[in-house]
Amino acid sequence: MSIDCNVVENVRYSRVLLKVSGEALAGERGFGFDQDVIGKLSCDLKKVRESGVELCIVVGGGNIFRGSSTSFGFERASNDYVGMLATMINALALQNSLEDMGIASRVLSAIPMTAVCETYIRRRAIRHLEKGRVVICAAGIGSPFFTTDTAAVLRSIEMRCDAIFKGTQVDGVYSSDPKKDCSATRYDKISYHDLLASDLKIMDAAAVSLARENSIPIIVFDLGKENAFSEVMKGRGTFTTISG
């Protein structure tokens, strides 16, 4: 597979957080990793990092474990902890792919796992960013009942990021699920208030409310498209901006 990993130019931000859903890493397989997807994503991340942008990533785990609190007879807290461990698997896989491309990265876990990665400490994470390393945050915020979207917003606030980029399987925020409703319309922009009032499910309410309180814009885009992240970083392509 030949991938163009040339440096992207004219980016609009200096430090950003990318939220990568687990489902996006699975590609069309729907479960586990799609190696081509991870390789293309890593190449895209390399372009952005080498353009001078400091980059933090929060990974989900839905490609490995997803289900309601009763899916496997687990109580909700246990269910969430299993999901946190799934994010660690994704984080280590992404780190390996990045370092194969020569991009220094560090995995920081909200749950101590000292045999495989560093424990998340805010000042340490910022220091890694300042040294040019990609910071990959795993295990959510380390507590059950909070989604990885909420973790992404929290980490972006802690690390003073300019914006949050949410890479999913759809190219923005729609009035309804575009996979189920062919008449769904996509928004170029939508306010935090309207997103919450319309009960649109692109992110949970806690995450959106936290972003609103701290005035951090959220850009939703389709991570599966070629060079999607680096293009959106330049304001190109199809995406939705949540702000105001």
UniProtKB/Swiss-Prot annotation:
Pathway: Pyrimidine metabolism; CTP biosynthesis via de novo pathway; UDP from UMP (UMPK route): step 1/1. Allosterically activated by GTP. Inhibited by UTP. It is found in: Cytoplasm. Its main location: cytoplasm. GO terms for cellular component: cytosol. InterPro entries: AceGlu_kinase-like_sf (IPR036393), Asp/Glu/Uridylate_kinase (IPR001048), Uridylate_kinase (IPR011817), Uridylate_kinase_bac (IPR015963). Keywords: Allosteric enzyme, ATP-binding, Cytoplasm, Kinase, Nucleotide-binding, Pyrimidine biosynthesis, Transferase. Residues 27-32 are annotated as: Involved in allosteric activation by GTP. GO terms for biological process: 'de novo' CTP biosynthetic process; UDP biosynthetic process. Gene3D superfamilies: Acetylglutamate kinase-like. It catalyses: UMP + ATP = UDP + ADP. ATP binds at K19, V20, S21, G22, G62, R66, T168, Q169, Y174, D177. One of its GO terms (molecular function) is UMP kinase activity. Its EC number is 2.7.4.22. UMP binds at G61, D80, I141, G142, S143, P144, F145, F146, T147, T148. Belongs to the UMP kinase family. PANTHER family: URIDYLATE KINASE, URIDYLATE KINASE PUMPKIN, CHLOROPLASTIC. Catalyzes the reversible phosphorylation of UMP to UDP. NCBIfam families: pyrH_bact (TIGR02075). Homohexamer. This is Uridylate kinase. It comes from Anaplasma phagocytophilum (strain HZ). The gene is pyrH.
